[in-house]
Design a protein with these regions (language model features):
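Residue-level detector of alpha-helix initiation sites
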Residues: 19, 113-117, 258
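Short beta-strand "acidic-cap" motif of Rossmann-like dinucleotide-binding folds
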Residues: 34-39, 134-135, 156, 234
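Short amphipathic alpha-helical segments and their helix-coil junctions
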Residues: 239-251
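Nucleotide phosphate-binding/pyrophosphate-handling subdomain across enzymes
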Residues: 3-11, 21-27, 132, 250-322
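Beta-strand->loop->alpha-helix junctions that form or flank phosphate-binding loops
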Residues: 93-96, 227-242, 279-283, 293
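Residues in the short beta-alpha loop(s) of Rossmann-like NAD(P)-binding domains
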Residues: 18, 40, 139, 215-217
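Phosphate-binding loop of NTP-binding sites
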Residues: 10-11, 26-29, 59-63, 70, ...
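N-terminal leader/targeting and accessory segments in enzymes
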Residues: 1-92, 96, 273, 310-313
Length: 322
């Protein structure tokens, strides 16, 4: 893939026109011929309809690249057979970002439970250290929507299994896998496929990169089958338990949220971050909306909104501490 060096117009099909699809179109359309397709044409706004291509026409069009949105399931969509025949052309907005910005420092956070909270907390920590930091991916803006990116910009990327599964070229300076439990198996079919999608952010790393990974036998077994070049650091659940007495924020009393802090403490050593600043930021951190959010509390009743949770395994530890 030579996207960065190509100045002549290329044909792009952007499949799926949610936030990531719109940002991909805006990013690519100046120097390339772009077409869009969505299973639900009605949701495409009038100002973008001039880019729409019908299914019958796109099937006879020779696209150079197919940019697919994470919400598209190749096995259950209108273009299923077409995508399977052209899998080598399928890329993501993550791939486009990396090819145009290979020098930008990226920190990718994935896993099953607590990705958003961990990503937002890291973003806050880096901002407190006065870094030009962007929060993107599955939280914040789509990655291609960020402007005025320089070599000093740091991207904190929350990556879901859906976003990583279709990526072909994206890699990250720091890749963090915070925990793994069964999730989205209706899409990935097997636990192995689900974990392999997460490992994509590690497999493409080089010798100068670092992967900070939960101490899981399944992850270790799968990594042994790959030619891993980066430095792998396995983090146990209580590696930094000695720092727990410095925390006053009740949101990190449950086991999952505290365990996920271990990965940020480990990362801080490699980035030479100030521990006092980290602790202060953690203690002032407010929970994200709809994530383990206490919306009512009395002597006899507590109502918790955890509607953003995608699995029961993320909710149970919070209930156990409340």
């Amino acid at each position: 893939m030579k996207l960065k060096n190509e100045t002549l117009s290329k044909n792009f099909l952007i499949y799926g026109f949610g936030k990531s699809g719109i940002s991909s179109l805006k990013y690519l359309k100046k120097k390339n011929r772009c077409f869009i397709f969505d299973d639900d044409k009605k949701k495409i706004k009038n100002k973008y309809k001039k880019f729409f291509i019908s299914k019958s026409k796109l099937l006879n069009n020779n696209f150079d690249y197919i940019v697919i949105s994470p919400g598209i399931n190749i096995n259950r969509c209108q273009l299923s057979n077409y995508l399977k025949k052209n899998q080598k052309k399928v890329i993501t907005d993550f791939d486009i970002f990396y090819k145009f910005n290979p020098e930008v420092l990226t920190i990718t956070i994935t896993g099953t439970n607590g990705k958003s909270t961990t990503s937002k907390l890291l973003y806050d920590i880096l901002k407190k250290h006065h870094y030009d930091t962007r929060l993107t991916g599955n939280i914040g803006n789509p990655i291609l929507e960020e402007k005025r990116v320089t070599k000093n910009t740091i991207f904190v990327i929350e990556a879901s299994s859906y976003q990583l599964a279709y990526s072909k070229y994206f890699k990250s300076k720091f890749s963090i896998i915070i925990n793994i439990s069964p999730d989205h198996l209706e899409r990935h079919n097997t636990m192995k496929n689900y974990v392999l999608s997460k490992l994509k952010c590690v497999i493409r790393q080089n010798e100068n990169d670092v992967a900070i990974i939960t101490n899981s036998n399944l992850l270790k077994d799968l990594l042994r089958t790959k030619n891993i070049k980066s430095k792998i650091i396995y983090v146990s659940k209580n590696k930094y338990a000695y720092l727990k007495n410095k925390l006053s924020n009740d949101n990190f009393k449950n086991s999952t949220n505290f365990q996920n802090l271990n990965f940020l403490f480990e990362l801080s050593k490699h980035m030479k971050l100030n521990l006092k600043t980290i602790i202060k930021t953690i203690n002032k951190f407010k929970p994200l909306e709809f994530r383990q959010q206490v919306i009512y509390q009395s002597k006899y009743l507590k109502i918790i909104n955890d509607s953003k949770s995608t699995s029961l395994s993320s909710t149970i530890p919070f209930l156990e501490t409340n």
